[in-house]
């Protein structure tokens, strides 16, 4: 299995269990998330509670919770939304920090295409949710989520150059 870690923080953000599509000249990866129900355990023991006078389930209070698979699996932490100024400030810092970690070839490719990806994200800014890795480190990359028209499950966006592939 391959795990993709944030190049700046080491947080696990994605794995090959979630297929991605490259967009914006390969700068962004688009990944489909899914809402899943977690925690509900329905055990049928074959008893008939109404015949025994117990109409209510007297077992444990087992609450079903809906979570997004990617957020839950990688313990992503949602952040407050960014306005345009905050987003541009973040991007400038992120580009500077990430560029320093890339080899010359990847650095050139990243700098050549990041402007288009930034404009793409700015165009969706009001619809984006922002997530960071489990460590919640300020200098780490962001993971973005949004809902495509008519979709009930979120789509996630990752900066491909900000991910490091690790075999598990």
From Swiss-Prot:
Its main location: cytoplasm. It is found in: Cytoplasm. GO terms for cellular component: cytoplasm. PROSITE patterns: TCTP_1, TCTP_2, TCTP_3. It holds the Pfam family TCTP. It comes from the Eukaryota. GO terms for molecular function: calcium ion binding. The keyword rRNA-binding does not apply. The keyword RNA-binding does not apply. Residues 1-168 form the TCTP domain. Keywords: Calcium, Cytoplasm. Involved in calcium binding and microtubule stabilization. Belongs to the TCTP family. This is Translationally-controlled tumor protein homolog. The lineage of its organism: Eukaryota, Viridiplantae, Streptophyta, Embryophyta, Tracheophyta.
